């Protein structure tokens, strides 16, 4: 038994730039031999994904549009995937969003539209995507999403995103229960804070990083490569007995007293 992902078709959703956790995951999966299917939303991200995919040493990636707030576009995306590869063996769901003004101050100030937007993109999108992909996961497989400690504990300024991540965490468990009989595993990685494009929207993010460097058992922050290698493990047969799990990759910060 090894970490090889050769012969596996894995969908990677959420790559924005070279600092994205999704890109760290994509590189680890590529190095393990997987064929990658990238999705993007919008022309700006299309260009970025094409440029990054072009840096990989195998030219076998597929790149498709997929707006996860649009069920018809999700269906179109996965119909195209089915036509091109037939079978999907994994999905890396690395998608989250909340309005910047919701990520500062008190959670109580969250408005209805902001609440629904954060949950639609950050939580429900996983269910919508899995629903579309399920008919193509005929050989079993693995689904991995990204969560954060702010879904378990109150983290300053994380606010509505923390509530959305708590919803995502519960979704992982229910999806794992639904899909286990088909040998499809569903897990999440709770990554430590990483300086990504989406992290820029969180107020006082630098203080969060400093706190981790001072208090986490490993005395350092997390890298996209560490998260990527953990994802590769969860996609591999080495993790075949794991489902419904939330695996923390945060230098141990989650065990520290607040």
From Swiss-Prot:
Q: Which of the seven top EC classes does this enzyme belong to? A: oxidoreductase
Q: What is its EC number?
A: 1.3.1.9
What does this chain do?
Catalyzes the reduction of a carbon-carbon double bond in an enoyl moiety that is covalently linked to an acyl carrier protein (ACP). Involved in the elongation cycle of fatty acid which are used in the lipid metabolism.
Q: Which GO terms describe its biological process?
A: cellular response to cold; fatty acid elongation
Expression is induced as follows: By cold shock.
Activity control, per UniProt: Inhibited by triclosan and acrylamide.
Pathway where this protein functions: Lipid metabolism; fatty acid biosynthesis
Record: residues binding substrate = 98
What residues does the record give for site: Involved in acyl-ACP binding? 206
Tell me if Oxidoreductase is a UniProt keyword of this record: yes
- Could you tell me the keywords of this UniProt record? Fatty acid biosynthesis, Fatty acid metabolism, Lipid biosynthesis, Lipid metabolism, NAD, NADP, Oxidoreductase, Stress response
Question: What domain of life is recorded for the organism?
Answer: Bacteria
What would you give as a GO molecular function for this chain, any one?
A: enoyl-[acyl-carrier-protein] reductase (NADH) activity
State which gene encodes it.
Answer: fabI
| PANTHER family, per the entry | ENOYL-[ACYL-CARRIER-PROTEIN] REDUCTASE, ENOYL-[ACYL-CARRIER-PROTEIN] REDUCTASE [NADH], CHLOROPLASTIC
Q: Which CDD domains match?
A: ENR_SDR (cd05372)
Report what the protein is called: Enoyl-[acyl-carrier-protein] reductase [NADH] FabI
């Amino acid at each position: 038994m090894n970490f090889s992902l050769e012969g596996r078709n894995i969908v990677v959703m959420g790559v924005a730039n070279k600092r994205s956790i999704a890109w760290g995951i994509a590189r680890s999966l590529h190095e393990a031999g997987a064929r990658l299917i990238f999705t993007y939303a919008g022309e700006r991200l299309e260009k970025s994904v094409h440029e990054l995919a072009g840096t990989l040493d195998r030219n076998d990636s597929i790149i498709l549009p997929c707006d996860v707030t649009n069920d018809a576009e999700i269906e179109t995306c996965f119909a195209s995937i089915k036509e091109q590869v037939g079978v999907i063996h994994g999905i890396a769901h690395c998608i989250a969003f909340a309005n910047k003004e919701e990520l500062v101050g008190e959670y109580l100030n969250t408005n209805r539209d902001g609440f629904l937007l954060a949950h639609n993109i950050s939580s429900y999108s996983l269910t919508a995507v899995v629903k579309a992909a399920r008919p193509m996961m005929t050989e079993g497989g693995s689904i991995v999403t990204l969560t954060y400690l702010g879904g378990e504990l109150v983290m300053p300024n994380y606010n509505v995103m923390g509530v959305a991540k708590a919803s995502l965490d519960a979704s992982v468990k229910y999806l794992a229960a639904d899909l286990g009989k088909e040998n499809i595993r569903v897990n999440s990685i709770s990554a430590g804070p990483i300086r990504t494009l989406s992290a820029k929207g969180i107020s006082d993010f630098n203080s969060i990083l400093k706190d981790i460097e001072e208090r986490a058992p490993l005395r350092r922050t997390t890298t996209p490569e560490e998260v990527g290698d953990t994802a590769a493990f969860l996609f591999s047969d080495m993790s075949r007995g794991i489902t419904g799990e939330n695996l923390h990759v945060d230098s141990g910060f989650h065990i520290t007293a607040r």
